[in-house]
């Protein structure tokens, strides 16, 4: 199974991968789309197929939202705990996992977008670090020294949400990146 919106390039890693997987006996592929396209929850579509086809394993492929700038488009994450569609952008849906579907779920996720708050947070962390290396009395560092990592992130989120709402950023060469990463993932699946 594949998750994602083929109409939005950074979220199209799943649908693009499925288009490259070689369909063989006992290997099924589906790109269920998103609720706005189909009117159906991804979980409901996948659950119906699982109940009918009784697969031994599900491989769910989806784009992720990174919590660190350096991870955007640089990693392919694998897990056997499933995936929750939409959770990276605050749009939680029913999880695709063993508990909900009754069979093992391998999730392949690629961080394709980063929240604007994460960019500000990571930039501030770097600024504070650089200033602390060059200044004895770093007033910016002192402002944030009592904040936990999550409290600092929440502060930036509250400030920015007032002005720009929920904004996600992706690299400018995202089309090429999606093609390359989809090919890597599909070639790996084709070797199974």
Protein language model regions, located:
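Glycine-rich phosphate/diphosphate-binding loop of Rossmann-like nucleotide-binding domains
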Residues: 1, 5-29
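Gly/Ser/Thr-rich loops at beta-strand to alpha-helix junctions
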Residues: 2-11, 35-37, 63-67
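Short acidic, glycine/serine/threonine-rich loops at helix termini
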Residues: 10-15, 40-43, 69-73, 118-120
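Conserved active-site and cofactor/substrate-binding residues in soluble primary-metabolism enzymes
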Residues: 12, 16, 41-45, 53, ...
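Short, surface-exposed basic-aromatic patches at helix termini and helix-loop junctions that form
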Residues: 20-22, 47-54, 77-80
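A structural signal for small-residue-enriched, beta-sheet-centric alpha/beta enzyme cores
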Residues: 30-31, 61-192
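Catalytic-core regions of hydrolytic enzymes
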Residues: 33-58, 63-64
